[in-house]
Amino acid sequence: MSQKWGLVHIYASYNNTILHVTDVTGAETIAKVSGGMIVRNQRDESSPYAAMQAAFKIAELMRDKGIDQVHVKVRAAGGQKSKNPGPGAQAAIRALSRAGIKIGRIEDATPIPHDGTTPKRKNR
């Protein structure tokens, strides 16, 4: 049986967690699920529970398309915002592996500024 690879982009901020599955080139979207699609309350969108449920849902959609192995790209807000991924990133990766999806590489794709715009000043 041939193994089909996919690419899971996990955008984890402190407001939401978005999981987006593409083919290996990143050109064709296969499935997309966010924490806001899972929970009812807006405050729970970024929670590890919402990320876990989104990962289980996306694993099911991937299996329907025949993808059983993935590489993972984790991304935080970055730029002038937080460079640390939100609480849902680790939970989503753990849930993907629990759902039976084999994980290849895990890569950080957070954008880092190379001296672009001036950050907001701190309050005194």
UniProtKB/Swiss-Prot annotation:
<dbReference type="GO" id="GO:0019843">
    <property type="term" value="F:rRNA binding"/>
</dbReference>
<feature type="region of interest" description="Disordered">
    <location>
        <begin position="104"/>
        <end position="124"/>
    </location>
</feature>
<dbReference type="InterPro" id="IPR036967">
    <property type="entry name" value="Ribosomal_uS11_sf"/>
</dbReference>
<comment type="subunit">
    <text>Part of the 30S ribosomal subunit.</text>
</comment>
<comment type="similarity">
    <text>Belongs to the universal ribosomal protein uS11 family.</text>
</comment>
<comment type="function">
    <text>Located on the platform of the 30S subunit.</text>
</comment>
<keyword id="KW-0687">Ribonucleoprotein</keyword>
<protein>
    <recommendedName>
        <fullName>Small ribosomal subunit protein uS11</fullName>
    </recommendedName>
</protein>
<dbReference type="GO" id="GO:0003735">
    <property type="term" value="F:structural constituent of ribosome"/>
</dbReference>
<keyword id="KW-0699">rRNA-binding</keyword>
<keyword id="KW-0694">RNA-binding</keyword>
<dbReference type="InterPro" id="IPR018102">
    <property type="entry name" value="Ribosomal_uS11_CS"/>
</dbReference>
<dbReference type="Pfam" id="PF00411">
    <property type="entry name" value="Ribosomal_S11"/>
</dbReference>
<dbReference type="InterPro" id="IPR019961">
    <property type="entry name" value="Ribosomal_uS11_archaeal"/>
</dbReference>
<dbReference type="GO" id="GO:0005840">
    <property type="term" value="C:ribosome"/>
</dbReference>
<dbReference type="GO" id="GO:1990904">
    <property type="term" value="C:ribonucleoprotein complex"/>
</dbReference>
<keyword id="KW-0689">Ribosomal protein</keyword>
<dbReference type="GO" id="GO:0006412">
    <property type="term" value="P:translation"/>
</dbReference>
<dbReference type="InterPro" id="IPR001971">
    <property type="entry name" value="Ribosomal_uS11"/>
</dbReference>
